[in-house]
């Protein structure tokens, strides 16, 4: 089993590790994961919020005040997550909060034996194929379960593209044809 230190790195990884350790200590990892998902959704939905967390114009005090009001309205006030986000704001690190959330999710997924996969296919998969693919990916990842999102993209013509964590396998017909085309150009 990989150590937490090797799963994430950098400044965002250090903050995520600290939050994950605190959440474990408080028995609140699921609650923190849910709260972070809520905050991440808020970031995704609001361009103003994204601009706010990235802007160097606001002081740490202004960011903390605004964040308190926002978290209060979202029902996250007084939680481990709100304490963490306020600390991040006070340290002027809100610009990296999306990376911190991503890294926390990596640590959380690893702790609960979950791997995430993104699959692209040319045509919709049957339920039995989805189940078989999940089982195969779980075996490859060495995890107890796999959460898989399937995207249908007819432009790949056939085959499959799988991204599992940081690994990607492109076994699409489109890629194979492009590879053959490139080799033919080299020869002729």
Curated annotation (Swiss-Prot):
SUPFAM superfamilies: N-terminal domain of the delta subunit of the F1F0-ATP synthase. Coiled coil: none annotated. Its main location: membrane. It is a peripheral membrane protein. The keyword Membrane applies. Gene3D superfamilies: N-terminal domain of the delta subunit of the F1F0-ATP synthase (1.10.520.20). Keywords: ATP synthesis, Cell inner membrane, Cell membrane, CF(1), Hydrogen ion transport, Ion transport, Membrane, Transport. It comes from the Bacteria. One of its GO terms (cellular component) is plasma membrane. GO terms for molecular function: proton-transporting ATP synthase activity, rotational mechanism. It is found in: Cell inner membrane. PANTHER family: ATP SYNTHASE DELTA CHAIN (PTHR11910). F-type ATPases have 2 components, F(1) - the catalytic core - and F(0) - the membrane proton channel. F(1) has five subunits: alpha(3), beta(3), gamma(1), delta(1), epsilon(1). F(0) has three main subunits: a(1), b(2) and c(10-14). The alpha and beta chains form an alternating ring which encloses part of the gamma chain. F(1) is attached to F(0) by a central stalk formed by the gamma and epsilon chains, while a peripheral stalk is formed by the delta and b chains. F(1)F(0) ATP synthase produces ATP from ADP in the presence of a proton or sodium gradient. F-type ATPases consist of two structural domains, F(1) containing the extramembraneous catalytic core and F(0) containing the membrane proton channel, linked together by a central stalk and a peripheral stalk. During catalysis, ATP synthesis in the catalytic domain of F(1) is coupled via a rotary mechanism of the central stalk subunits to proton translocation. HAMAP family: ATP_synth_delta_bact. Belongs to the ATPase delta chain family. This is ATP synthase subunit delta. It comes from Methylocella silvestris (strain DSM 15510 / CIP 108128 / LMG 27833 / NCIMB 13906 / BL2).
């Amino acid at each position: 089993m990989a150590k937490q230190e090797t799963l994430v790195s950098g400044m965002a990884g250090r903050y995520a590790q600290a939050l994950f350790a605190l959440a474990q200590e408080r028995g609140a990892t699921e609650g923190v994961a849910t709260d972070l998902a809520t905050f991440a959704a808020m970031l995704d939905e609001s361009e103003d919020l994204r601009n706010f967390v990235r802007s160097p114009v606001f002081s740490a005090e202004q960011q903390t005040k605004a964040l308190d009001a926002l978290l209060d309205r979202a029902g996250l006030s007084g939680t481990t997550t709100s304490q963490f986000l306020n600390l991040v704001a006070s340290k002027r690190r809100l610009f990296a909060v999306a990376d911190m959330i991503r890294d926390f999710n990596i640590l959380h997924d690893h702790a609960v034996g979950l791997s995430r996969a993104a699959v692209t296919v040319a045509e919709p998969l049957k339920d039995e194929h989805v189940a078989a693919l999940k089982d195969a990916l779980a075996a490859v990842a060495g995890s107890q379960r796999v959460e898989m999102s399937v995207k249908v993209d007819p432009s790949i013509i056939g085959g499959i593209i799988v991204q599992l964590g940081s690994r990607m396998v492109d076994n699409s017909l489109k890629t194979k044809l492009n590879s053959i085309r490139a080799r033919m150009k080299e020869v002729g």
